[in-house]
Amino acid sequence: MAELTISSDEIRSAIANYTSSYSPEASREEVGVVTTAADGIANVSGMPSVMANELLEFPGGVIGVAQNLDTDSVGVVVLGNYETLKEGDEVKRTGEVLSIPVGENFLGRVINPLGEPIDGLGDITDTEERALELQAPSVLMRQPVNEPMQTGIKAIDAMTPIGRGQRQLIIGDRKTGKTSVCIDTILNQRDNWESGDPSKQVRCIYVAIGQKGSTIASIRQTLEEHGALEYTTIVAAPASDSAGFKWLAPFAGAALGQHWMYQGKHVLVIYDDLTKQAEAYRAISLLLRRPPGREAYPGDVFYLHSRLLERAAKLNDELGGGSLTALPIIETKANDVSAFIPTNVISITDGQVFLESDLFNQGVRPAINVGVSVSRVGGDAQTKGMKKVSGNLRLDLAAYRDLEAFSAFASDLDDASKAQLERGERLVELLKQTEHAPQSVEHQMISIWLAGEGEFDDVPVEDVRRFEAELIEHLRSNASGVFDQIAGGTPFTEESQAQLKQSTSEFKRGFQTTDGTPIIREPEARAMEQDEVKQSEITVTRKTV
């Protein structure tokens, strides 16, 4: 058996190597203890150094956001299943403020307000982190809004135009088509996306707050069927989610949009709707025992929306010239725009599109009340061609509404008033559009210009929309040069106007109304007078046998 020898030098060397590589460390962790947990709110004792909006970790991987920072306790909004929490549970600080992953791979996906995919299509890779609560761009970082954000809806693009970087409120009662207006705006960006031109492409973010899960699934299907999902991200906080998720969802959409905006890209964010976010924030504030104010909303509910919507901007060229356009939706009750939340958001935004239930029930869709709707950016957000053809449209419609109200009491109207009424009826009909069928700027310009020139005056009201659709198809085939000339909203030339007039006259000759009569009838033949007829006498000679 071999003899075991131990060298003291080897032992000394091994001990020296171990001690040189060892660095004594002491980990320090600040923890707290749950005192109460109910209704999505947890009160935690301890953690005197916790930060506002810091993420806290509960047992089972549940996270929360620190909100109330009292001297001896912290009020935490729990994000996730709070029913598993109980008194005495240990809570750990993370040292991080609430943030979400962002990146190009979020396009075409459905995520929750924490940036986690919920569409069953796997994890999202190659991402960066961005804080949810970010300071809005300063005044010096911005430039005036001067690029149009085409919605594809004539009534909006012509009279209440939206620009890239603008905040335009969509407001109205429930079931008046607010979501449809916003979805059509997303669908209208498809041609820009397919062009491949970064200066035209618009990335869209649809934030669904407090909606039914089936409604969100239906919207996703609509976007997919129309080829719009590839440039759209859906941030979903359905009605089944806790109030904390509904409160944070708009900030998640804004953080994702700002990531692209600071890269010099153009983004459209739709918040559907901020009324439900305000209600969720009210519930959180009351559970945190913050003092209530008007309509039981907390005192900082205005700041909740202002700091969110101020993140929409058109950056200056030094920062890349990117933009973030916001379309917040607010639901009113009985068309009452003087309620607390509607007046708050109206004062924050750069204009509003007001949808009325009365117009909707009359078949005017989109049900936009032109008199109340306004865009504070105005013509700066329009192309030169659209600005030129739509200059008198709002005035014509306003005059028609006044005359319509007057005609209800007046028995006799002069010919000029009757003509104005008839043209107004056709303008209202012309501004109606089918859902999910946005129109190009060239289509809109041609329709509005021809209506202003009186080309629709002899078309029966019930045939106006069919006449317009068939006329546009006819013009695409027989006057395609006009579409090329006004592409992108360039003003009409005199040659284009003459060609439009001629092609429209040709089309009218072959167009038949619903009852089968042509618009342009051939003049009836006039009976000839007796002295205008010359007859030769015919003499028949009959031989007798």
Curated annotation (Swiss-Prot):
Cellular compartment(s): Cell membrane
Transmembrane is among the record's keywords: no
Gene3D superfamilies to which the protein is assigned, alphabetical: 2.40.30.20, ATP synthase alpha/beta chain, C-terminal domain (1.20.150.20), P-loop containing nucleotide triphosphate hydrolases (3.40.50.300)
Enzyme class: translocase
Gene Ontology MF annotations: ADP binding; ATP binding; proton-transporting ATP synthase activity, rotational mechanism
GO CC entries: plasma membrane; proton-transporting ATP synthase complex
Reaction(s) the record says it catalyses: ATP + H2O + 4 H(+)(in) = ADP + phosphate + 5 H(+)(out)
E.C. number: 7.1.2.2
InterPro entries: ATP_synth_asu-like_sf, ATP_synth_asu_C, ATP_synth_asu_C_sf, ATP_synth_F1_a_nt-bd_dom, ATP_synth_F1_asu, ATPase_a/bsu_AS, ATPase_F1/V1/A1_a/bsu_N, ATPase_F1/V1/A1_a/bsu_N_sf
Binding-site residues, ATP: G172, D173, R174, K175, T176, G177, K178, T179
Predominant cellular place of this UniProt entry's protein: membrane
Site entry: Required for activity: S373
Family: Belongs to the ATPase alpha/beta chains family.
Subunit structure, interactors included: F-type ATPases have 2 components, CF(1) - the catalytic core - and CF(0) - the membrane proton channel. CF(1) has five subunits: alpha(3), beta(3), gamma(1), delta(1), epsilon(1). CF(0) has three main subunits: a(1), b(2) and c(9-12). The alpha and beta chains form an alternating ring which encloses part of the gamma chain. CF(1) is attached to CF(0) by a central stalk formed by the gamma and epsilon chains, while a peripheral stalk is formed by the delta and b chains.
Stated role: Produces ATP from ADP in the presence of a proton gradient across the membrane. The alpha chain is a regulatory subunit.
Protein name per the record: ATP synthase subunit alpha
Source species: Corynebacterium urealyticum (strain ATCC 43042 / DSM 7109)
Gene name for this UniProt entry: atpA
